[in-house]
Amino acid sequence: MDNIVERVKKIVAEQLGVNEADIKNESSFVDDLGADSLDTVELVMALEEEFECEIPDDQAEKITTVQQAVDYILAGKK
């Protein structure tokens, strides 16, 4: 689980140009990390590539925090 959290945070840091140390599990991509709609689309694509999964658009819209991304990935790995 920690490995997934770290991987998600690394991707978020790379995609949004923020310091990984500033990213918390409850960080909102838009409100806390300054992402815009294009950033969030690119972030979802990067997560799909990293974790070899597909995140449907209706689900991607619900993923607004680091923890929600981690939870979605964990649910898909079961």
UniProtKB/Swiss-Prot annotation:
PROSITE patterns: CARRIER, PHOSPHOPANTETHEINE. Keywords: Cytoplasm, Fatty acid biosynthesis, Fatty acid metabolism, Lipid biosynthesis, Lipid metabolism, Phosphopantetheine, Phosphoprotein. GO terms for biological process: lipid A biosynthetic process. GO terms for cellular component: cytosol; membrane. The keyword Ribonucleoprotein does not apply. The keyword Protease does not apply. GO terms for molecular function: acyl binding; acyl carrier activity. InterPro entries: ACP (IPR003231), ACP-like_sf (IPR036736), PP-bd_ACP (IPR009081), Ppantetheine_attach_site (IPR006162). Residues 2-77 form the Carrier domain. The modification O-(pantetheine 4'-phosphoryl)serine is found at S37. 4'-phosphopantetheine is transferred from CoA to a specific serine of apo-ACP by AcpS. This modification is essential for activity because fatty acids are bound in thioester linkage to the sulfhydryl of the prosthetic group. Carrier of the growing fatty acid chain in fatty acid biosynthesis. Belongs to the acyl carrier protein (ACP) family. This is Acyl carrier protein. It comes from Dechloromonas aromatica (strain RCB).
